[in-house]
Regions:
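Short alpha-helical hairpin
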Residues: 2-20
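Divalent metal-dependent phosphate-bond-processing catalytic cores, especially two-metal-ion Mg2+/Mn2+ enzymes
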Residues: 2-6, 26-32, 36-51, 97, ...
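N-terminal glycine-rich anion-binding loops that anchor highly charged ligand groups
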Residues: 11, 33-35, 53-57
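Active-site flanking loop/helix segments enriched in acidic
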Residues: 16-34, 67-72
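Alpha-helix boundary/capping segments in eukaryotic regulatory proteins
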Residues: 28, 49-56, 72-80, 99
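His-Asp-centered metal-binding catalytic motifs of divalent-metal-dependent phosphohydrolases/nucleases
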Residues: 56-74, 84, 106-115
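An active-site-proximal "capping" alpha-helix that borders the catalytic cofactor pocket
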Residues: 38, 79-94
Length: 192
């Protein structure tokens, strides 16, 4: 059954169902709902901007973007963004997805915390970042209607203390490898 949230649906495909199942089984409820909101906000931004893209690739990029914060997919020495991108790459490769499409998703995830660059790249890369920036930072908040924002959050609720909870989740996912945060926004998460 396909659920419509603010006029956006998750792709009705075997690949999307497997992505949902894997993310639900691997990530916390907080990250699952955050990643889902990222997808809806990203797709709404794409619709508003008139961008053309493969919705399955966008869904994969959004749902895997924080996978590198999980114990299962966290390496000892790579940035969490790269760990998440590698997890998506391995998953998509196992499903026979083309290398070109894998590279798009990998790049979208690897750059999702690098402001200013993704907006100049492939629509999937730009939109994953746009969805993340809206859900975590509220960037472009006014570009979404009250109805859209409410529908997304109703379908995938925020915790009562989302800001503190997501920062704690970032901290827990990267504290064992502080050197990977040098020169990026996650350095602030580890700062005392």
């Amino acid at each position: 059954m396909t659920v419509n949230v603010a006029g956006i649906t998750v792709p009705d495909s075997q690949l999307a169902r497997e992505i949902t199942e894997l993310v639900r089984d691997t990530e916390s409820e907080l990250l699952f709902h955050h990643s889902s909101r990222v997808y809806y906000f990203a797709a709404l931004a794409g619709q508003r901007r008139g961008l053309r893209y493969d919705p399955e690739l966008l869904y994969c990029g959004c749902m895997f973007h924080d996978m590198g914060l999980t114990h299962r997919h966290s390496s000892a020495c790579e940035r969490f963004e790269v760990d998440g991108a590698n997890a998506a790459r391995d998953f998509l490769k196992s499903k026979g997805i083309s290398q070109q499409d894998i590279d798009i998703v990998w790049t979208a995830i690897a750059l999702h915390t690098t402001p200013g660059i993704p907006k100049h790249m492939h629509p999937v890369v730009a939109l994953v970042t746009a969805g993340v920036e809206m859900d975590v930072l509220g960037l472009a908040y006014q570009e979404y209607s009250d109805v859209e924002r409410d529908a997304v959050v109703r379908a995938h609720p925020r915790t009562p203390h989302f800001k503190e909870d997501i920062i704690q989740t970032f901290y827990d996912g990267i504290r064992h490898k502080p050197d990977t945060t040098f020169g990026n926004v996650k350095a602030d998460v580890l700062a005392d």
